[in-house]
Curated annotation (Swiss-Prot):
This is Hemolin. Induction: By bacterial infection. GO terms for biological process: defense response to Gram-negative bacterium; homophilic cell adhesion via plasma membrane adhesion molecules; immune response; innate immune response; response to bacterium; synapse organization. Gene3D superfamilies: Immunoglobulins. One of its GO terms (molecular function) is axon guidance receptor activity.
């Protein structure tokens, strides 16, 4: 009797579990953000994976119906993809695509359409520096306004010839996240009559680098300081908030001779790591930067750098790292599944977020309702699923740090 019950239960589980089916209209994945340059044609893609013909597409912008025909926009044939012919600032917004077919109404996740730009300085100047030999030095470089935030690169360049330039890889020299260049000590090898240190900005808004400022070091002042070995804080990170999934860099830069190699600890535990580790001090900064390749929620805590060059007084600096997270799926449904009529059917959808992100469900692009559907932290249960329940089910979560959307097409057999 027990054996028969087990067999019957196994059969029920097999029938209730989602199974692959013949492909029907399912939207291709889209990027969460699309950047555009003003007046440069840009595409917001929306198309089914198989390029299905009998699909009617529509769009929303910032939560409202978007009539693209009233704008300088074209639509690709047999797709919902929009081609912004000459996009401008007013085209920025949060877009969403809908694809209606015999299977129901499929919905894309929200696509952020943003203008990329950078405010380019009108002048370039070269500043001559004459630092004290063996002292620490800061070469300033302000990051221009722009979106996304421009990237700063430093190079050692021969005069005005940008084609003759080298990357700066000296252990004593490290760039801060604000774009400034720091020398733990300036030495004779840094002096040159021909070369200069050039700070440049890079951005998706502009082709190539944009030089911002240059510095020459043609000579050094004689050092009369008898305490040259004392460690001096040049740049250290303050308490930080990091987003899960992002790269996080914590800085601990001290000047002094000889140069110190910071040791790193998290809540008292050594996190120096190896070059291949997710958390490591080995990233071409001689330990002055702790590199977290992918930030996790469990990285929250207090990071401390111990600095000692065996000459000056040892130094210590602590940074409190707080980790937040936009919604991230820990479990989500397949894009297309089949359910057996009459059985209870579960659509899995589990989300991790900090702070917590409420989950909402849609059916064919509308808020879901009905006494036979029950939402839980692990997913959506449809009791006694029927043919009329065929369609697209969307699981969406949102908090102040982002949003996530997953959708599945349920076919009832």
């Amino acid at each position: 009797m027990v054996s028969k019950s087990i067999v019957a239960l196994a059969a029920c589980v097999a029938m209730c579990v989602a199974q692959p089916v013949e492909k029907m209209p399912v939207l291709k994945d889209q990027p969460a953000e699309v950047l555009f340059r003003e007046s440069q044609a840009t595409v917001l893609e929306c198309v089914t994976e198989n390029g299905d013909k009998d699909v009617k597409y529509s769009w929303q912008k910032d939560g409202k119906e978007f009539k693209w025909q009233e704008h300088n926009i074209a639509q690709r044939k047999d797709e919902g993809s929009l081609v912004f012919l000459k996009p401008e600032a007013k085209d920025e917004g949060q877009y969403r695509c809908f694809a209606e077919s015999a299977a129901g109404v499929a919905t894309s996740h929200i696509i952020s359409f943003r203008r990329t730009y950078m405010v380019v300085p009108t002048t370039f100047k070269t500043v001559e520096k004459k630092p004290v030999e063996g002292s620490w030095l800061k070469l300033e470089c302000s990051i221009p306004e722009g979106y996304p935030k421009p990237t700063i690169v430093w190079r050692k360049q021969l005069g005005e010839d940008e084609s003759i330039a080298d990357s700066i890889l000296a252990r004593r020299i490290t760039q801060s996240p604000e774009g400034d260049l720091y020398f733990t000590s300036v030495e004779k090898e840094d002096v040159s009559e021909s070369y200069k240190y050039v700070c440049a900005a890079k951005s998706p808004a502009i082709d190539g680098d944009v030089p911002l400022v240059g510095y020459t070091i043609k000579s050094l002042e004689k050092n009369t300081n008898q305490k040259n070995g004392e460690l001096v804080p040049m740049y250290v990170s303050n308490d930080m908030i990091a987003k899960a999934g992002d790269v996080t860099m914590i800085y601990c830069m001290y000047g002094g001779v000889p140069m110190a190699y910071p040791n790193w600890f998290k809540d008292g535990k050594d996190v120096n790591g190896k070059p291949s580790d997710r958390i490591t001090r080995h990233n071409r900064t001689s330990g002055k930067r702790l590199f977290i390749k992918e930030t996790l929620l469990e990285d929250q805590g207090t990071f401390t750098c111990d600095v000692n060059n065996e000459v000056g007084k040892p130094q210590k600096h602590s940074v409190k790292l707080t980790v937040v997270s936009g919604p991230r799926f820990t479990k989500k449904p397949e894009k297309q599944v089949i359910a057996k009529q009459g059985q209870d059917f579960v659509i899995p959808c589990e989300v991790s977020a900090l702070p917590a992100a409420p989950v909402s469900w849609t059916f064919n692009a509308k808020p879901i309702s009905g006494s036979r559907v029950v939402a839980s932290p692990s997913g959506l249960t449809i009791k006694g699923i029927q043919k009329s329940d065929k369609g697209y089910y969307g699981c969406q979560a949102h908090n102040e740090h982002g949003d996530a959307y997953a959708e599945t097409l349920v076919i009832v057999a």
